[in-house]
Amino acid sequence: MERKMTEIELLIDFHKDAERQGPGSHEDTLRALSFTDFDEKRRLKVADIGCGSGAQTISLAQNLNAEITAVDLFPEFLEKLNINAKNLGLQDKIITLEKSMDDLPFDHGEFDLIWSEGAIYIIGFEDGIKKWKDYLKIGGYIALSEITWTTHSRPAEIEDHWKKEYPQVDTASHKMKVLEENGFSPVGYFYLSESSWIKNYYKPMEDRFDQFLTKHKNTELAQGIVDAEKDEIRKYRTYKDYFSYGFYIARKVK
């Protein structure tokens, strides 16, 4: 008898072949990187935490003289990253590590740059900063994209949704304060554009719905995943003026 896939297995199967597991773009990654001032001649050590299938990891490898440790909990995503890195001749710059982001085996002051796009929410913005700061050299940089309110008041539906999904959702000014209170000096910030959400994330997702449902024989769990994603897309289209991903770039000063 064929074993039924769990919800998390279905979610991985739905997202593993996508270029991205969240909003973003090559241009967003490079824009965030432009706020740093690394010596191009010095080989850097970089950690990309919660990397997924690694679209941004590839961008970093193509634009930095660096050894990049790409961390994710799910081997299916890391396998995709390894294949892409090899196809692009970047396999010598990227090391993949299957590990939880709250249990990392890194040394104190090991990295020049810690990167995480759309993933720090898993352990929370403040907790993530406090944990990961130890792995960063003084003068090193942290770059994070994080769900952020873009106004000080919101319609009840989207306010209630995000406070339930992620209680640490807040405005950029509050996130900057958290960075400053934890030994960082913010050097750059911007919101992700609508195309980073729609063109690069939601539209490709919509294109996969039918194939995913057919593959999994329209089971209740598979349909539930698609329905939840459709509702997320609806909320973004309806309330995009009130929230986005903010990209925060900060330098460790103490």
Where do the PLM segments sit?
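Short, glycine-/aromatic-enriched active-site segment of Class I SAM-dependent methyltransferases
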Residues: I147-Y166
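Conserved alpha-helix/loop element of class I SAM-dependent methyltransferases that forms part
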Residues: P23-R42
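A short acidic, Gly/Pro-enriched loop at the edge of an enzyme's catalytic core
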Residues: D102-L113
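Conserved Class I S-adenosyl-L-methionine
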Residues: F190-K254
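Class I SAM-dependent methyltransferase SAM/SAH-binding core
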Residues: A47, S53-D103
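A short SAM/SAH-binding and catalytic strip from SAM-dependent methyltransferases
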Residues: L113-E126
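A short glycine-rich, Lys/Arg-flanked "PGG" loop and its adjoining helix->strand segment in the class I
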Residues: D127-Y141
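Short alpha-helix
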Residues: Q168-G183
